[in-house]
C-alpha cells in the first residue's frame, strides 16, 4: 500500500470534467485507489464518490493505492492532480 498527501493544483479542482478524467485515469490501473479528504474516504474510480468530496484547487488530499501497479498508479495520478 502506498499513501501520499497531495495538494490539488488544478485550476478548477476535481470538479466535473477534471473529475471524470481523473476517474478515467484511475480506472486504467488494477490497484484499488482511494482518496481521503477531511476524514472521508472514497473509491477514486467512482465519479460520484469523487464529486461528493468537493475537492477544490488548493485542497490537500490523501491518495491511497494498493495492488500490483500501486506505484505506477500513484505516480500517474499525482502528476494529474498537480497539473496547473
UniProtKB/Swiss-Prot annotation:
Keywords: Phosphoprotein
Keyword Phosphoprotein: yes
Function of the protein: Involved in carbon catabolite repression (CCR).
Domain HPr: 1-84
Pfam families referenced in this protein's UniProt entry, alphabetically: PTS-HPr
Record organism: Halalkalibacterium halodurans (strain ATCC BAA-125 / DSM 18197 / FERM 7344 / JCM 9153 / C-125)
Membrane-crossing residue ranges in chain numbering: none
Name the record gives this protein: HPr-like protein Crh
Family: Belongs to the HPr family.
Coiled-coil ranges from the UniProt annotation: none
Positions carrying Phosphoserine: 46
Signal sequence interval, chain numbering: none
